[in-house]
């Protein structure tokens, strides 16, 4: 029995001592900002195995921290190292995954996760999703055309503007973004792995619901929400449709919206 009240990695003293003949399936999610699902299960397995109890680890993810390791482990995929910008535009090491069938696995928290920044540094007015666009570009240049995107655990609330900016910088040199969407990204399909259904804007949107945990003051929340509204309005005028109110648009600081509006992504809820 796992004791997670304080994330203290202790086993309950009941029910496990006399169960050595049993096989335990360990299927946990990550502890936000603390341990990935694989790390949690490794800790549990170490204690159980020491008591002679057999374990099977099945890492789980809601799309946030640990999604990449869980997905690649489950599919037998590989991790590809990349050098990108983090949420404060500092150069950093990151990874994306590639499954045996060539599907790219991208965990946005690799580029703009809460775990990448100290609590006192959190500032969603400055934090950017630029590195997410770089992750996508690296995978596309490698030849990947099918993507599974893990949304969650971010310290950003930029509605995906940073990600779009990176894609423009990388793919739209010498041509407009619409042309780049068709030529460079037109063959790509994106499936979003997400466990929230918030819209982009409003009281239930990205800024109001998740902004405070990312360091936003009440004044920042209002500014972030207004910025997202303006971005959605301009985007709707350009494309002739608006996906900002769809469930999950507010996921990962609004990255869900940018993926759906600009890249035609499909939202999939679940673990």
Where are these regions (language model features)?
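N-terminal loops that bind phosphate or other acidic moieties
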Residues: 22-151, 155-271
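N-terminal regions of proteins, emphasizing targeting and processing segments when present
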Residues: 5, 20-21
């Amino acid at each position: 029995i796992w004791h997670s009240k304080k994330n203290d990695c202790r086993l309950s003293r009941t029910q496990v001592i006399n169960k050595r003949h049993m096989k335990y399936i360990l299927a946990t999610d990550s502890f936000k900002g603390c341990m990935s699902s694989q790390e949690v299960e490794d800790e549990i397995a170490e204690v159980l195995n020491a008591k002679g109890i057999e374990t099977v680890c099945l890492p789980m993810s809601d799309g946030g921290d640990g999604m990449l390791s869980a997905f690649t482990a489950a599919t037998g995929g590989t991790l590809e190292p990349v050098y990108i910008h983090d949420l404060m535009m500092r150069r950093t090491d990151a990874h994306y995954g590639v499954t045996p069938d060539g599907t790219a696995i991208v965990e946005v928290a690799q580029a703009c996760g809460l775990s990448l920044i100290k609590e006192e540094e959190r500032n969603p007015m400055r934090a950017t999703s630029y590195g997410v666009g770089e992750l996508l570009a690296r995978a596309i240049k490698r030849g990947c055309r099918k993507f599974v995107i893990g949304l969650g655990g971010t310290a950003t609330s930029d509605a995906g503007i940073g990600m779009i900016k990176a894609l423009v910088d990388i793919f739209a040199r010498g041509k407009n973004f619409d042309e780049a969407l068709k030529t460079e990204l037109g063959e790509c399909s994106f499936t979003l792995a997400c466990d929230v259904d918030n819209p982009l804007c409003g009281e239930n949107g990205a800024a109001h619901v998740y902004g405070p945990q990312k360091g936003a003051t009440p004044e920042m929340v209002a500014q972030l929400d207004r910025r997202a509204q303006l971005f959605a309005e301009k985007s709707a005028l350009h494309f002739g449709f608006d996906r900002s109110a769809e469930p999950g648009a507010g996921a990962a600081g609004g990255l869900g919206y940018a993926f759906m509006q600009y890249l035609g992504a499909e939202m999939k809820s679940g673990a």
